[in-house]
A protein has these predicted regions:
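Active-site glycine/GP-rich loop and adjacent strand/helix microenvironment
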Residues: 1-224
Length: 224
């Protein structure tokens, strides 16, 4: 929510919904609203979230409430069966309108394929980004057949946390390149991590082939 709130307006207008969605207290209502706002658009080209389990959860909520969601898209509403604060519903009004043609298209997809996969309801999806390392593969394997990988590039989201984004992946590997121009980094050799007197190194002191732990100071002064 903070990311969507703070991005430049020229980018923000391309999002399917406002940051206020992330302030919906009820988890199920929040996920329903996220997918309801996104599914009304055929031309979604990018889908990004940190944990791939979120992809599965959003698809589950969509499928379990599909007819209700299609009715919402058709009529331009958001179901009253979900607990969404009045002020957030009011803000969402500018993002929704009746789209009977889109609802009909989605029903036709369901009738012809027997399922609702992203490769069918978002045919122009070009980019998917989540974490891809560690045990995230457990979740990834459950939706890999739902995307058209000839059209959609799947990239590691990169080195990111609540406090800041540390780096970005430049290819289809799980490696991240640090953003040295955005934060201040210090490094400690792996062998010194448990030492009470750590030797902190600057980025120009690192040696190729060695392993380090990164300590980050953000623009706001947060040290981690």
């Amino acid at each position: 929510g903070v990311l969507v709130r703070d991005i430049p307006s020229i980018i923000k207008k391309h999002y399917t919904g406002p940051a206020a969605v992330m302030s919906i207290p009820d988890y199920g209502a929040r996920n329903y609203t996220l997918m309801r706002l996104a599914l009304q658009h055929r031309d979604v080209t990018l889908w990004a979230t940190a944990n791939p389990s979120t992809i599965l959860e959003l698809l589950r909520v969509m499928n379990e409430n599909l007819e209700e969601m299609l009715h919402d898209i058709e009529t331009g509403g958001i179901s009253e069966n979900f607990d969404i604060p009045f002020e957030i519903r009011a803000e969402l009004d500018q993002y929704i309108s009746p789209k009977p043609e889109r609802a009909a298209e989605l029903r036709k997809i369901l009738e012809e394929t027997g399922h609702m996969y992203p490769k069918d309801f978002w045919p122009w999806l070009q980019y998917l980004s989540t974490w891809k390392c560690g045990n995230t593969k457990i979740y990834m394997d459950k939706y890999m057949d739902q995307f058209d990988w000839d059209k959609t590039f799947y990239q590691e989201l990169g080195y990111i946390a609540t406090e800041c984004r540390f780096g970005f992946s430049l290819d289809d590997t799980n490696e991240s390149v640090l953003f040295p121009q955005f934060h201040y980094y210090e490094f400690v050799e792996e062998s010194e991590l448990d030492s009470p007197r750590k030797h902190f190194l600057q980025i120009d002191e690192l040696e190729l082939g060695k392993r380090y732990c990164a300590y980050v100071t953000t623009y706001s002064g947060l040290f981690r």
